[in-house]
């Protein structure tokens, strides 16, 4: 038996994305967003949505670029702070002791201490209401060597990405792998005639 | 030291979304997508992206509606199968023994056995390349009573949502809560002068 929860923005899990930008003074800034995801494979594109009232909004509109950092468990409190405080009120990254370098591909900063970052050029902007959705075309992804194996594949146990639960408002690490895509479902596939 | 992984569609984690539609014969169908997320709070909107080659694509274009089911741990193999097989080849839901009812709000089916479903009206369609992104305005969310407490709040331990790791291609349950949003970051906030 199902009960109605009403019309709400609820999906589980969401990523915990730190959006990096340069403001109109050229200062690096960052904010945390959970409204986002992958939206295309070729070209590789992602979405991130944020409110017009944010300090980051103007930077995105002006520079047409952002970096998107995947939050790992060690940066839980830092990412939460980046979602609470505003770049208008001071140097958030400095407060956290985080350092940035300029991306060579897009007009946005890379936060060096975060393990995985997407460098994105904004290709579409959609005003959806309270949030504006920025579709970014991924120009490159950079990852710390420590979260890659010798073949350059990602090591999730090293990356330790965080997931977020909207409305419940909690952050979670990933449990163990419970199955593999395009494999776990094979047991339901029709058996081929012998 | 960071290494370049190239331009790829990578974010961690993604949700595991089962997209419900009616085909041109009025038959219920479902496919699994990981390219999606929340994109606006007011009005509440979500995105889901899929390829033109999918059977579901034509249904979305025709009916301008979909349901989005959050996959829970018990439905891991079912959702993986729904992402492997095509509705062109047979009754996927029937194969899985899953049953549907018609949504009263949008022209799409609700899979009764999945614990949480969003009923969505398509408000924007964006051809991004290999994938087309369908922005859906959430008309209502319905949840099994067993995943709600007496106040109607979601119980994550009962819901057990799955997260997906692109490229690594594994499904994961959520670990324990490691912190609470708008709270864990307080330790970085400037202390107010006494």
UniProtKB/Swiss-Prot annotation, chains A, B:
The keyword rRNA-binding belongs to this UniProt entry's keyword annotation: no
Sequence intervals crossing the membrane: none
UniProt record similarity statement: Belongs to the flavoredoxin family.
Cysteines paired by S-S bonds: none
Name under which the protein is recorded: Flavoredoxin
Gene Ontology MF term list: FMN binding; oxidoreductase activity, acting on the CH-NH group of donors, NAD or NADP as acceptor
Cofactor binding description: Binds 1 FMN per subunit.
Cofactor(s) this protein cannot do without: FMN
Organism whose genome encodes this protein: Megalodesulfovibrio gigas (strain ATCC 19364 / DSM 1382 / NCIMB 9332 / VKM B-1759)
Described function: Participates in the reduction of hydrogensulfite from hydrogen.
């Amino acid at each position: 038996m199902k009960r109605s929860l009403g019309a709400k923005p609820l999906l589980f899990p969401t990523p915990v994305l730190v959006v990096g930008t340069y403001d109109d003074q050229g200062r690096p800034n960052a904010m945390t967003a959970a409204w986002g995801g992958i939206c295309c494979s070729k070209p590789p594109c992602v979405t991130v949505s944020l409110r017009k009232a944010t300090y980051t909004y103007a930077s995105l509109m002006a520079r047409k670029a952002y970096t998107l950092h995947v939050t790992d468990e060690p940066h839980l409190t830092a990412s939460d702070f980046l979602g609470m405080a505003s770049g208008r009120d001071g140097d958030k990254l400095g407060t956290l002791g985080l350092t940035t370098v300029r991306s060579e591909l897009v007009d946005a900063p890379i936060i060096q201490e975060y393990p995985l970052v997407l460098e994105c050029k904004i290709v579409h902007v959609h005003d959806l209401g309270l949030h504006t959705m920025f579709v970014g075309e991924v120009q490159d992804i950079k990852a710390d060597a420590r979260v890659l194996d010798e073949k350059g594949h990602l090591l999730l146990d090293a990356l330790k990405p965080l997931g977020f639960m909207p409305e419940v408002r909690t952050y979670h690490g990933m449990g163990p792998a419970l199955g593999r895509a395009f494999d776990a479902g094979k047991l339901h596939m029709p058996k081929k005639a012998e």
